[in-house]
Every structure is written in structure tokens, then in C-alpha cells.
């Protein structure tokens, strides 16, 4: 009878993990988690004995510590290494895929020798156990446990996950995001990037996905190793790091530019859902309290039904701003030509309105005619004629036109200057 379906593939990792030659393996295997010393907040331990320590999961959840982490700082005059003690059930029966990845990385990890090491622990997740092993026989060290109430790195990861979830559709359709993410993928995960390029030459999907899982594990392992030695790499091998980033980034950008951005809706939809899945992982990893992480994920997943209420609230906010915010009046000065055009238009409109009023049946025409000096001129105006006679137009031009008396008085009279 074969192994139970669901997690049988985890058994493939047990033989290499069981026979993996890691330094300090014999000592780590001999140590039992039960006799390790328990660490608590504000502990300060000074000792010269090589021992193991555990920080147990905190069962009492306090919401003010949503983005808090525990920092275990180990200092010593001499060199030492930290060996993580992976409990048996952590590798064989992991709680989730993230726990399994951490277990695999810790088993493959080569302990780093240093005289100062800081371990970041999530207080509400799995129990973390480690042992302090000296390089030399004469050895003393100090352990200081402190709580970082607001871990900004954790908070930024959470904010990045929320932002990525809501803008996944926009980013999946953006050529800039396509080129930049492809370049970053080529620099950080070269194996995954190369595998995506040669995908067409792999006949079976099962083979491709098996290679993809292997490339992802290898890439994560390499990135985690390099992150530990990032300062040393930057100060000692700055030229090589810059050369690698520039060369690999340039070729990655060229390959992405050659293939062009995603054009069909199926590829864009696939990228959008991958970004949303990645955003949920970031939200889960960016919160110390699992209960809050689950609530945030459920709220994000149900946010599609809140789309219309949010739009209604946004519209009401815009209307309220329109009602209570006074707009600044913009004054625009007219040119002389614009002034003449508007004056002519308004004058003609007013004269036409006056003609319509005079043509109405209830207009007192006899009373008006009895009071006019020239009734014939008024009759011509009502029938569509001009309201000015040629003599009046000529007199106006003589007084107010070019060379007229009014203009000369304005130009040459000192009192009007």
C-alpha cells in the first residue's frame, strides 16, 4: 500500500535531510529540545557553557503586538556559530509550506561564524530552538532578549501586500512593471528566469513544474545565503556585485523587451492572479499575529463585494468637498478685439429681444408712437431695420473714431493723463 496522498512528496526530502553533512550536526542531533533553556522577554544571560535555547510560541495574543518581533542578540569576544535545532515533526509533518521551506533552508544552511549574531523571532508562530557552539574551547557569551514593538520591515511587507492586491490588475497591464519585474526576476532568480526562457523546449508539463520547484528552492536558498553576507559582499566584492547586476539585468531587460509586454487577456489575467496570490503571501508574512493575518486575508478576498460601496463613499466625499470648498475665482482680462466682439454680440441680442417685445399683441404701440419724435424710424427698427441713422453713425465716428475729438482730448489733455 502506497503512502497516503496529499503529503507523500515530503518523504522525498527525508533521505537527503537525514544524511546531510552540516557542521555541528552531531551535537545538534544529540541535544533534546525538552532540556533546552526557555527564553523570555528581557532575559539577559551570561554564560560560558555551550547550550541550547528555545523561544516558545506565545499563546496569549495581544493586538498591540501585531507587527512586533523578538530580537535575540548574542555577543561574545570570540567566534561562535548558531545551529538551529529542527524538531522531528517540523520537517516530516510541517504545518504549512512556509514551515517546510524554513526547515529545508535551515538543514541545508552552513552556520556562519561571528562574534555578534541577532536572531529575529516571530513570537506568535512556531517555536524556535538553537544552540550556541564556540569555535574555540575557551568561550563566554551573552544573550539579550528584547521585543521590537513596531518592526517597520514587517509593517512594510504588510503594506506592500495590500498595495499589490488592490493594484494587481493595473500592474499586470503596465509595460513598465513587466520590464522592471522581469529584470528583477533575472537578477535575483536567474535559474527561474532561464527556465522560463527554455520552457518551449521542455516537452512535458510535469517535467517543467518539477524543474520549476527545484529552481525556486535553489533560488530562495541562494538569495537567503547572499542576504546574510550582503554587507561583506558589498564592501569586499563591490565591483563583482555591480558587474553581475548590470550584466544580468541588461540581458534580462533585453529578453523581456524582445518578447514584448503581455498582449493577450489570458496572460494578463494569469499574471494578475499570480500577483494577488503573492500579495496574500506578503500579507501573511507581514503580520506577527496569525489571527490578524487570516482576518486581513479574508477581508481582502471579500473586498470585491465592497467595490461599489467604496465607490459610493468616494463619490460622496467628492461632493462634500465640492460643497464646502470655495473655488478660487480666475480673472481673465479681455483684449480689445474680444471686447468689441462681445459688445457687438450682446448689443445685437438685446436689440433683437426688444424687437420681439414690440411685436407682441399686448404691446402699447399707440402710446409709444404718440411719445416718439420720429415714429417712422421706430417702425423701421421693429420691421428689422437699423436703430441708428446714417447721420448718427457719421457723427459717432467723428467724435469717437480715429482722429476724433474724444481721442485727441484723451491723448493731448494733461489733466486726463
UniProtKB/Swiss-Prot annotation:
Parts of the chain that traverse the membrane: 148-168, 177-197, 207-227, 239-259, 280-300
GO cellular component terms, A-Z: nuclear envelope; nuclear inner membrane
UniProt superkingdom: Eukaryota
The entry's keywords: Membrane, Nucleus, Signal, Transmembrane, Transmembrane helix
Intracellular or extracellular location(s): Nucleus inner membrane
Keyword flag Ribonucleoprotein: no
Signal sequence interval, chain numbering: 1-24
Family to which this protein belongs: Belongs to the NEMP family.
Name this protein carries in UniProt: Nuclear envelope integral membrane protein 2
Encoding gene (name): NEMP2
